[in-house]
């Protein structure tokens, strides 16, 4: 059961990153994900403000349960988590402070930058997928310049492929 909990988090991280990159593919972006990105300065409700097609992609992580045996309680917990986790990820705050000594990281600043620049910070979890795939933007000028260079190179490739 403990191994399942660890594996499901890794699966959800990888699934979210790949689906998020997929829906940034121009035809899917225009059809569905553009609705979500109307929230340039997102708030908690922005997380689930998605086109129905995007909801299908997002919750397709549950397809795993059709092929592998999981305890029903585990399935319920992970689906509830999938439904509620977009809210804290869209608050725009990096930490929640409960008192003078206690605070916890909610990592939503990276997703705020994703809504601001669109072409970075696709991941949303414990795996450093944005770092591994070169899409991390930490808010620094250096990250901004790397993102611009990556986009410029991508756009040049698209231009030369069209000519």
Where in the sequence are the language-model features?
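Alpha-helical transmembrane segments of multi-pass membrane proteins
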Residues: 5-16, 77-86
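Transmembrane alpha-helix/helix-exit interface in multi-pass inner-membrane proteins
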Residues: 10-30
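Cytosolic/stromal cytosol-facing helical appendages immediately following the last transmembrane segment
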Residues: 25-163
